[in-house]
Amino acid sequence: MVVLGSTGSIGKNALKIAKKFGVKIEALSCGKNIALINEQIKVFKPKKVAILDPNDLNNLEPLGAEVFVGLDGIDAMIEECVSNLVINAIVGVAGLKASFKSLQRNKKLALANKESLVSAGHLLDISQITPVDSEHFGLWALLQNKTLKPKSLIISASGGAFRDTPLDLIAIQNAQNALKHPNWSMGDKITIDSASMVNKLFEILETYWLFGASLKIDALIERSSIVHALVEFEDNSVIAHLASADMQLPISYAINPKLASLSASIKPLDLYALSAIKFEPISVERYTLWRYKDLLLENPKLGVVLNASNEVAMKKFLNQEIAFGGFIQIISQALELYAKKSFKLSSLDEVLALDKEVRERFGSVARV
């Protein structure tokens, strides 16, 4: 298989599962962590390797692997790969072209890059995509029951770093505080997306494209991250998917469902410890951006705007140019502005053009 973004949290776990299942690695790609990909090359001996920055070529130790550079290089690498499975764990809209290329080459796409579905779900062949996250894996597992008719799909949120921060102090928080996730150890971007609830807006849109635009879709807070998803059926019964908070479960099913079902990749749940499970609504007072959930479900192509403005705001926030209130404000302004506009987005080029327009418009926003 091919692992794009092999040095990130998902990529590292995917390689662990590949080793366990005896799956050979044809190709790897990474962003800036050349030291780690050099170690991965030694262990997995891929035939092809892609890195983002040509300035890192001198430090790369490909050990005979063919080397590709940049986002176009990743596309070229996918073009040449014979593997049937591509795991796309690239962070951000940078992973969008790789998703398109993988599907064009008739590969099965294990998708951890949320931005692909958020920005271009209407253009992707969903039948070839397996989502790599705990919420959508939970929904998939629950929807295997073909007797009951689903009515609404519900995913859970931990609440992120600011779930207990006094409301009047949220706007002044910095990135260092936003990166203190209560339950998970993840990359910087997804951890901050969790604090802002952008991650859950992304996952709501992913649910829309993956499992049914006709169903009611919602989210709630479950602080322990043990309940990942719930499905309410037409008979008003509800079934929940519970599992330890460990990404190796959805990753293992994305790689090989049969092997994944025959052996455990996560620790068993201690059912006696579950007395603490409690569901809470997502408050728009605390999570201001959550008020756009219905707007996004009514016009899911606004996902391009959500993602582009989020990446612009994220960069400013991580660079300490703005506080958390400014971060939220940039995204709010972008969604309010583009909600009034009409766009078709009938091709990848049109998606990328709108993405660029939003970045240019909001990238120049002064300090907030």
UniProtKB/Swiss-Prot annotation:
Highest taxon in the source lineage = Bacteria
**Signal sequence, renumbered to the chain:** none
Give the binding site residues for NADPH.
7-10, 31-33, 113, 115, 187
Q: In which pathway does it act?
A: Isoprenoid biosynthesis; isopentenyl diphosphate biosynthesis via DXP pathway; isopentenyl diphosphate from 1-deoxy-D-xylulose 5-phosphate: step 1/6
| Role noted for this protein | Catalyzes the NADPH-dependent rearrangement and reduction of 1-deoxy-D-xylulose-5-phosphate (DXP) to 2-C-methyl-D-erythritol 4-phosphate (MEP).
Which protein are we looking at? Answer: 1-deoxy-D-xylulose 5-phosphate reductoisomerase
A GO molecular-function term, please?
A: manganese ion binding
Gene3D superfamilies from the xrefs?
1.10.1740.10, NAD(P)-binding Rossmann-like Domain
Q: Which amino acids does the record list as binding Mn(2+)?
A: 133, 135, 203
* Annotated residues for binding of 1-deoxy-D-xylulose 5-phosphate: 114, 134-135, 158, 181, 194, 199-200, 203
Q: Indicate the enzyme's highest-level EC class.
A: oxidoreductase
- EC? 1.1.1.267
Q: Does the keyword DNA-binding apply?
A: no
Which biological process terms from the Gene Ontology are attached to this UniProt entry?
A: isopentenyl diphosphate biosynthetic process, methylerythritol 4-phosphate pathway involved in terpenoid biosynthetic process
Cite a single Pfam family from the UniProt record.
Answer: DXP_reductoisom
What this protein catalyses is: 2-C-methyl-D-erythritol 4-phosphate + NADP(+) = 1-deoxy-D-xylulose 5-phosphate + NADPH + H(+)
InterPro entries with a match to the protein in the record: DXP_reductoisomerase, DXP_reductoisomerase_C, DXP_reductoisomerase_N, DXPR_C, DXPR_C_sf, NAD(P)-bd_dom_sf
**Required cofactor(s):** Mg(2+); Mn(2+)
Keywords annotated in UniProt: Isoprene biosynthesis, Manganese, Metal-binding, NADP, Oxidoreductase
UniProt keyword Metal-binding present:
yes
**What protein family does this chain belong to?**
Belongs to the DXR family.
